[in-house]
Amino acid sequence: MRKLASFLLTLLLTALPLKEALALNCYLGGSGGPVEETKTISPFAIPSNAQVGQKIWESDDIKIPVTCDNNVTSGFKPEDVFAWVNPYPAATDPYYELGVTYEGIDYDATGQPNGVDTRQCLDNDNITIYTPDQIRQMGWENRICSGNPDDIHITRTFVARLRLFVRIKAMPPHGYVSSLSDYIVVQFDGKGGVNQMADAKNLKYHINGLQNITVLDCGATFTIYPENQEIDFGTFSARDIVNQQTRMRTFSIRTTKVQDAQCSDGFKMDSSFYTTETLSADDTAVLIGNGLKLRILNGTAPYTFNQYKEYADFTGDKMNVEQNYTAELSREEGKAIQSGPFETVVLFKINYH
């Protein structure tokens, strides 16, 4: 009997860590939703003048609705939700490196898994057996995400904003086709690490379609006017904005195809105005944070930030494309304008295809 008791005790002790490892579930959309999502890279091209270390493709902004629940870790402890980049290190392409831009920060899918805090905290399911008053009497406020026993969340739903990208780690030869197919770039899981069980209910985001990449023997150059790449709205008062409604400045981007003896490929380009700042009006306005907002116009139509659209076609005889834009500054609805200098950064990005 002593041997049997000892054996059973050992089994229980070794089983406990496994139970904790399976503690957190995360789904696409609502609780019980899908746990697999795939982004297929649309066909795109690498210009001949691309540089090692440069991003050669980016997705549009991807806004993923994530719901996490089932925190049953021991000790009634809360759990932080993490986005794990490169959760399953595996064979990679010799020329291309995958990555994720999460909340404006780049994470390469190389080496060991890289945990990114989503700033979402999940209260323990088991703590709900106690009333808020009982939790206070036990001094367990520190086991509640908010520190308030009246504000317990055993389910969290949030929107993860990310972009997928491909970076060059070595210049591929003309005509190269990648053999890398499906790759998991992100998994939503607990702070403790990646749940690799086959039946894990942890949302995984896949990327595939690297075989759609074409290596060009041509490229293009860009010239931005004004040449300092700064748009200066000058000095003005809040009253000026109220009276005039908007202040406008123009700028332009000229793109020239590099046509040399080696260039035999035609190609197209998509462009995007990219920002990490807060957006409004269906992502057509950047909120500067001082009561003002910025739009970029094509004629009178506003561009949607962080979304790619067709920009230039060099499949024919055309060698140059010049596009004029208007930067429009106006008052943010319902906000008072704060005086003082300000700046915001918007990047012009290109995908070849």
What are these regions, as identified by a protein language model?
Residues 1-8:
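Bacterial N-terminal signal peptides that target proteins for export
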Residues 22-353:
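Mature extracellular/passenger domains of Gram-negative fimbrial/pilin and adhesin proteins
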Residues 9-10, 328:
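Intrinsically disordered, low-complexity serine/threonine-rich segments
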